[in-house]
Amino acid sequence: MKIEKMNFYSPKKYKWKGIKITEQAIEQILFLINKNPKNKGIRIGTKKSGCAGFRYTMELVKNNTIEKENKNDIVFYYNNILVYISLKEAPFLNGIKIDFVKDSINEVFKYCNPRIKTFCGCGESFSID
């Protein structure tokens, strides 16, 4: 990977608070990345969904897509995890906490954002102030 291609987010522009990833989520993300040597990191984003507007997304970034990444991405390391965030989605992700929760047979990443204004009835989508 070429470090000179990394883009750095301007904290003053959006009063960037960063993201927080819990130890449980870090362990699960590293487990998923290490399942395939082509996996190099994660992309965190949002997608239009549901009746309230958006839902959070997380996908693995493969080695062959690193060179194709948009120059409008924020790229940084978080506890040895290479993280990509689109600059246009950064305001939606500002200040989020990502956790990994095991509840009986269900295992899921949970996203906590103090700026969420409303949830849809099923809790899948949200809107932000």
From Swiss-Prot:
InterPro entries: Fe-S_cluster_asmbl/transfer, FeS_biogenesis, FeS_cluster_insertion, FeS_cluster_insertion_CS, HesB-like_dom_sf. PROSITE patterns: HESB. One of its GO terms (cellular component) is cytosol. Coiled coil: none annotated. GO terms for biological process: iron-sulfur cluster assembly. One of its GO terms (molecular function) is 2 iron, 2 sulfur cluster binding. Disulfide bonds: none annotated. It comes from the Bacteria. Gene3D superfamilies: HesB-like domain. Belongs to the HesB/IscA family. This is Uncharacterized protein BUsg_114.
